[in-house]
Amino acid sequence: SALFLAMHYTPDTITAFSSVTHICRDVNYGWLIRYIHANGASLFFICLYLHIGRGIYYGSYSYMETWNIGIILLILTMA
């Protein structure tokens, strides 16, 4: 869904809101693509947090190298 959104989205600060409105109104099923993309991203981060919680529960933080690589990947994912 991100590829279809990227075809119509304009990152310019002046026209960004207009391009989102264009996606929702003028693109066939654009509102659905935007909705699926937003909910898919939310689900991705929920799964990410569950994975961190599982690592904390099972004591994976004691493996410092593995844990630090995971934290770096988390920060890079959010950046």
UniProtKB/Swiss-Prot annotation:
It is found in: Mitochondrion inner membrane. GO terms for molecular function: metal ion binding; ubiquinol-cytochrome-c reductase activity. Keywords: Electron transport, Heme, Iron, Membrane, Metal-binding, Mitochondrion, Mitochondrion inner membrane, Respiratory chain, Transmembrane, Transmembrane helix, Transport, Ubiquinone. Its main location: mitochondrion. The chain crosses the membrane at residues 1-7, 31-52, 67-79. Signal peptide: none annotated. This is Cytochrome b.
